[in-house]
Amino acid sequence: MNPGDAQSIDRRCVRRSFDASAERYDEVAVLQREVADRLLERLEPVRVHPRRVLDLGAGTGYATRGLLRRYRKAEVHAVDLAPAMLQRVRRRAPWLRRPRCVCADLHALPYPDDSFELVFSNLALQWAEDLPTALRELQRVTAPEGAVMFATFGPETLHELRGAWAEVGDQARVHRFADKHDVGDRMLEAGFVDPVLDGESFTLTYAQPREVMRDLKALGASNADPGRPRGLLSPHRLARVEAAYRLAWRQPDGRVPATYEVVYGHAWGMGGTPQRADDTGEVRLDVHGIRRRRR
């Protein structure tokens, strides 16, 4: 994938969408919690003892609370673009040990150079308007011996929905995501040392295609491309999209899949050797619960 193949992002649209979804976000963020848990597990072999930790794109604070438990002596900062998300972080934080909540754009973080020994980001980088700039900011605030650990979405994410829209002549309704090779190249250009990227595929299953779109809206994961189609979607056009989705992807049990390709990345600020995670396969999931593949 070339850098220009990924869609551009309207940051104001991203902020509005996540602000609007904050109250319902935790009800539907099944995949986001699972990926956060796996990303937190990947910290176990990484030899860092941070004084300060950055949770970038903290959302409602699920991973923030995991970081507080793991690094009990560290000062944890929860950063998000959406103020309503940070209100949820504050509301759910431990009374005796609250994170520092900062509303900020990941393209211009309000911190000095080398501020954090650990930068953690769960499913936020895909919303960067300019990925190279965002990665340079992450590198800038990472201490020389600090580690960066993140997860983002890859290009196979929601390919079923994208294909259904293409069948009715509209490919711009579903966001396109950068692949791991492009992300790795951008990390090297940003100055990270020895970036390692791998990934795995998750499949959520739904009773109807409309439920896929309903969950995306509840998550705030709307298409933020400035060139996206505007205006209300007609019932007739929505019915055509659903029919195309079912025709191509309906499973024997009548449910339809929604695939998410998750790319994991980790590196060091200026030195050290990150630990490589184990290889993983595909995991199939019901929207009401996650079943982990036995290894």
From Swiss-Prot:
Leading EC class: transferase
Pfam families: Methyltransf_11 (PF08241)
Role this protein plays: Converts the free carboxyl group of a malonyl-thioester to its methyl ester by transfer of a methyl group from S-adenosyl-L-methionine (SAM). It allows to synthesize pimeloyl-ACP via the fatty acid synthetic pathway.
Family indicated by similarity: Belongs to the methyltransferase superfamily.
Gene3D superfamilies: Vaccinia Virus protein VP39
InterPro entries referenced in this protein's UniProt entry, alphabetically: BioC, Malonyl-ACP_OMT, Methyltransf_11, SAM-dependent_MTases_sf
Assigned EC number: 2.1.1.197
Pathway: Cofactor biosynthesis; biotin biosynthesis
Species of provenance: Halorhodospira halophila (strain DSM 244 / SL1) (Ectothiorhodospira halophila (strain DSM 244 / SL1))
Transmembrane domains' residue ranges: none
A GO term, aspect molecular function: malonyl-CoA methyltransferase activity
Name the record gives this protein: Malonyl-[acyl-carrier protein] O-methyltransferase
Keywords of this entry: Biotin biosynthesis, Methyltransferase, S-adenosyl-L-methionine, Transferase
Reactions the enzyme catalyzes: malonyl-[ACP] + S-adenosyl-L-methionine = malonyl-[ACP] methyl ester + S-adenosyl-L-homocysteine
Example GO BP: methylation
